[in-house]
Curated annotation (Swiss-Prot):
It is a multi-pass membrane protein. The keyword Metal-binding does not apply. The gene is MT-ND4L. It comes from the Eukaryota. Core subunit of respiratory chain NADH dehydrogenase (Complex I) which is composed of 45 different subunits. GO terms for molecular function: NADH dehydrogenase (ubiquinone) activity. It comes from Alexandromys kikuchii (Taiwan vole). One of its GO terms (biological process) is ATP synthesis coupled electron transport. PANTHER family: NADH-UBIQUINONE OXIDOREDUCTASE CHAIN 4L, NADH-UBIQUINONE OXIDOREDUCTASE SUBUNIT ND4L. Core subunit of the mitochondrial membrane respiratory chain NADH dehydrogenase (Complex I) which catalyzes electron transfer from NADH through the respiratory chain, using ubiquinone as an electron acceptor. Part of the enzyme membrane arm which is embedded in the lipid bilayer and involved in proton translocation. It is found in: Mitochondrion inner membrane. This is NADH-ubiquinone oxidoreductase chain 4L.
Amino acid sequence: MSPAVLNITMAFTFSLLGTLMFRSHLMSTLLCLEGMMLSLFMLATITPLNTHSMIMFPIPIAILVFAACEAAVGLALLAKISNTYGSDFVQNLNLLQC
């Protein structure tokens, strides 16, 4: 395993651990999810270059599309929750209420 792939894998792992550990604020969870998507994008960009596979070249573009959609939905949800409840604490939310 090359050092670049190892660093990207470690970045994904640390972002996943951050998502699991810092669940109290919605903003920190969204930042960790963005870190995961960035590391997946970098890994999907490096892999076709190393394997010389032409079929895998559109995959990074699809990952960028999903990352942009995830960021837009996350920021809209953060704005709505912040305006409604006054903070982004996840523990204070009862999402089962209508």
